[in-house]
Amino acid sequence: MTLTLVKAWTAAKDRLKDAGIDQPSIDARLMLEVAAGVTRTEIVTDPYRELSAEQIATLNDYLERRARREPVSHIIGRKGFWKILLQVNKNVLTPRPETEVIVDEVLKAFPEHMAFSMLDLGVGSGTILLAVLAERPAAKGLGIDASSEALAVARENAANLDLNTRAALLHGDWTTGLGSDSFDLVVSNPPYIPTEVIDTLEPEVRIHEPRLALDGGPDGLAAYRELAPEILRVLKPGGLFAVEIGYDQSQAVEALFRAAGATEVRTVKDLSTHDRVVLGVKNPLESPA
């Protein structure tokens, strides 16, 4: 029996819907694009193109994995973020649209042709670092992560985006070994989910994503307690920081950064109107160490 693109998409949507998957239409299309080697446009403009037996087998494998709640990004090995396409796997946190709030705020603060240095703590797949560097050609950045497997993904992404000459990637423990007053910008999407909450999350997250990137300790604030004074240390006077937070952590995280000496501390909401990013500045009058 022949299977066309339109029939394959319809069957895939139905199969995912029956499996209780959210957004079955989008997931089915993304997996069909990769399995059949087509674009979204081709599915619409050439709907009666037939799939080969190999393509059908690949799509069926993808659908079985998705029905077991493996994330689509892990199945197809990629995820769009901001204006870039990133390679992803089980060793990195899947980029989320709410993290784009950090990129948006950074681009507002740093004009297009401005030269500046940035640090991304817990760089993962390179999500924030590479999205910013792709938009700011005069900028250079350093990404640090405790996971060597995550760094391998980030290096691949930097190379694929031709950003490896401006993005340095190092294995390390947050800011250990970094000099004071070194960066114009520090960003981070640290683990912020309370330990006991992780087991209540959807299977795509609790089973398939690295716990190191999720677990924020008993109250979800462990990373921020460590990061706040260190981010203020490595920032240049007048430098900006932006960190992602959980929806209910704004007050606590703002307080930690104020206690560390930050000024102009504020919280920005995401498109779902949840508190998402805490920003602030290192006192520009502070003398370099």
Swiss-Prot record:
It catalyses: L-glutaminyl-[peptide chain release factor] + S-adenosyl-L-methionine = N(5)-methyl-L-glutaminyl-[peptide chain release factor] + S-adenosyl-L-homocysteine + H(+). InterPro entries: DNA_methylase_N6_adenine_CS, HemK-like, Methyltranfer_dom, N5-glutamine_MTase, PrmC_N, RF_methyltr_PrmC, SAM-dependent_MTases_sf. Keywords: Methyltransferase, S-adenosyl-L-methionine, Transferase. GO terms for biological process: methylation. S-adenosyl-L-methionine binds at residues 122-126, 145, 174, 189. Its EC number is 2.1.1.297. It comes from the Bacteria. Methylates the class 1 translation termination release factors RF1/PrfA and RF2/PrfB on the glutamine residue of the universally conserved GGQ motif. Belongs to the protein N5-glutamine methyltransferase family. PrmC subfamily. NCBIfam families: hemK_fam, RF_mod_PrmC. This is Release factor glutamine methyltransferase. The gene is prmC.
